[in-house]
């Protein structure tokens, strides 16, 4: 009968571990989603800045790019 008691305790421990893992995973997912949103916003800002430079003086932008080794 001692085996049954420890088996029940083991299962309880496993379910608690599962809940802890799920909580950590949920927190990590929320942090990843927040970081993804920040990066997306930064990329959008950078693309907007490039667009405005190109609208103002595309020829100068291309010359500068080629001089730096771009093709």
Swiss-Prot record:
Region (ARC ATPase binding): 27-65
Leader sequence segment: none
GO biological process: modification-dependent protein catabolic process; proteasomal protein catabolic process; protein pupylation
Highest taxon of source: Bacteria
Coiled coil ranges: 29-60
Alphabetic keyword roster: Coiled coil, Isopeptide bond, Ubl conjugation pathway
A UniProt-annotated Pfam family: Pup
Low complexity composition-biased segments: 1-18
Cross-linked sites for Isoglutamyl lysine isopeptide (Glu-Lys) (interchain with K-? in acceptor proteins): 71
Pathway: Protein degradation; proteasomal Pup-dependent pathway
Chain segments carrying region Disordered: 1-42
InterPro entries: Ubiquitin-like_Pup (IPR008515)
GO function terms (MF aspect): proteasome binding; protein tag activity
The record's note on its domains: The N-terminal unstructured half of Pup provides a signal required to initiate unfolding and degradation by the proteasome but is not needed for pupylation, while the C-terminal helical half of Pup interacts with ARC to target proteins to the proteasome.
Protein function: Protein modifier that is covalently attached to lysine residues of substrate proteins, thereby targeting them for proteasomal degradation. The tagging system is termed pupylation.
Family per record: Belongs to the prokaryotic ubiquitin-like protein family.
Subunit structure: Strongly interacts with the proteasome-associated ATPase ARC through a hydrophobic interface; the interacting region of Pup lies in its C-terminal half. There is one Pup binding site per ARC hexamer ring.
Name assigned to this protein: Prokaryotic ubiquitin-like protein Pup
Species, as recorded: Salinispora tropica (strain ATCC BAA-916 / DSM 44818 / JCM 13857 / NBRC 105044 / CNB-440)
């Amino acid at each position: 009968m001692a085996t049954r008691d420890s088996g029940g305790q083991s299962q309880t421990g496993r379910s608690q571990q599962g809940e802890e893992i799920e909580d950590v995973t949920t927190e990590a997912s929320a942090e990843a989603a927040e970081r993804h949103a920040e990066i997306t916003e930064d990329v959008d800002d950078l693309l907007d800045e490039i667009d405005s430079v190109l609208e103002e003086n595309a020829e100068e932008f291309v010359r500068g790019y080629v001089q730096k080794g771009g093709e």
